[in-house]
């Protein structure tokens, strides 16, 4: 078994005053550093769980570090495209977006997570920005009443090429960012052999979190910020407008208390405001 010395804590800046604190778990050596097990010794189940965790982390990063206009739900009409071949759909969708960038003269960006129906067909959920106002329009009859009443928009170019879609203007960026991570499921991760790398896909370039600091001595205030437990680490998302880096880490405890506030979704957030079929998906076990 091989091991390497790793930090006890790591802090990443997401922008807009948002930071992620990570406290790593493991066995301490006499010098208070952590020893972490090499990936080569991990079981397949552990690796799959790690893939799932990494994918969720990256989706949340992209969701929080970039500005988005709409929550997007896109389906695939069997008469227009093969709904069962995700690779072909992703390739065609990427080319479709490149074509629309030229048509609209706009830098369209997207972050999308595929979801599989029980019959094996695919559809997608995600975030999108850069669509000009004249590319989208309100739903009109005979569209379902919930789409018209809910203020959802149609992207006709997508609908003509692939099938039904809906766009919901984003009103709560934090809650929407956390909501989209729910579609990165462990079941999707375990089907990785069938879908390759496509736990999610996105346009380029997108901004990612930037490492602000590594801390190699245990720090109690940082540890207490980490409220999410995982197999190998604990994490916490916080607001800290005045949390300036590089910070004074001369000792194991900070010189002064810095006011930090947890980044959490609004408990009153209603998913049906961005996902018109939320209740149906929930009943079918997708959420």
Where are the regions that the model predicts?
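Right-hand nucleic-acid polymerase module
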Residues: 1-120, 131-287
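Short beta-strand->loop micro-motif that forms the acidic, two-metal-ion catalytic signature
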Residues: 124-127
